[in-house]
Amino acid sequence: MQKKRILFLANHFITLHSFRKELINELVRQGHELYLSLPEDKDNKFFEDLGCKIILTKIDRRGVNPMKDLQLIKFYKKMIPEVNPDIIFSYTIKPNIYGTLASNGKYKQVCNITGTGATFLKRSLVSTICELLYKISIRKCYKVFFQNTGDRDFFVKEGLVKDNYAMLPGSGCNLEQHAFKPLPDGDEYRFLFIGRVMKLKGIDQYLQAAEIITKKYPNSKFLIAGWNEQPEYMMLVEEAQKQGWVEYIGFRKDIDQWIEKCHCTILPSHGGEGVPNVLLESAATGRICIGSKINGTMDVIEDGKTGYLFNTGDGEDLARQIEKFILLSPEQKAAMGRAGREKVEHEFDRRIVVKAYLDEVEKC
């Protein structure tokens, strides 16, 4: 294969390291020249040591400050021609939109819709502007990858894409890194919430369910791992912790070990996910997953077979699904864990995602 110059546009080190390092490793192994546009982070050295060139980029991941966004477009307009890539891979809303606007169809850009986040969950001025920007920018996009059918259907229905798209199984899961482990022994049931502490992630439903279940089953333990994103919801977590309903363990770089210690991973998100990586990694480890009925989550969880689904925003229904798990026999719990692993092996192997990107590199 001819050696190519490839530019990645991302909004955080974790975006590439947690979900795309296998792709980057393979591209480096094949001898391609890689440029990574990322915000400053001490961990960027990981990619520098691989031989990638880091382009420090100021990007406000969640803010809606027009001046900062204009500065980002201006930066991309200057930087992209300087790199002069054969192909651009972008992830998340701002790199997708502003990267495509800046390159203006002069460069082949592959946009990955990793999930719409809070942007399109309710109609607002911000969502209307984002939709308009997507309409303008994605027309200039060479290819669009979707991670779930719900996002794809929305973009097609709204006329944001025509036929320049394909489906991916989320970001995929590294099956070697997330090896199958038997469920923990003992009489205690341990449940794990992994995500930012905020309304969108359904933290209030998790707290409600934790209280209901802990009162009925005192041998239950509910853990919360993630950043404090909204202080008002962190106050609810702290109060629940005082009552003994939950334990907050903060953001964990060793989250794999915590998944192994628990029986269930719970994702009560209200929407905007791609295909949730926490569910893929938990299921691959053999953990039962319980999630809300949203796009992406419903692709991972087969209700009653690999886990349970509950009505989005309904803490009482979440508690009912948790109780279903508790009442299973040890053999039934183990079978559900194995079924989850098998589903990830068959449908969400990260090698599928890597191959899709390598195919685009070969064609460019």
Show which residues each predicted segment covers.
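Nucleotide-activated donor-binding/catalytic signature segment of Leloir-type glycosyltransferases, i.e.
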Residues: M234-R252
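Donor nucleotide-sugar binding/catalytic pocket of nucleotide-sugar-dependent glycosyltransferases
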Residues: I55, K135-F180
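A conserved mid-protein helix/loop that constitutes part of the nucleotide-sugar donor-binding site
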Residues: H17-E22, Y189, F193-I212, E316
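A short, well-ordered alpha-helix in the C-terminal region of glycosyltransferases
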Residues: D317, K324, E331-E347, V353-D359
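Short hydrophobic beta-strand element within catalytic cores of glycosyltransferases
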Residues: I288-G291
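Short His-centered aromatic/hydrophobic patch
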Residues: S90-N96, I113
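Conserved acidic donor-binding segment of nucleotide-sugar-dependent glycosyltransferases
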Residues: E302-G304, Y308-G315, K324-P330
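Glycosyltransferase donor-sugar binding loop
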Residues: L36-K42, C173, I194, K221-M234
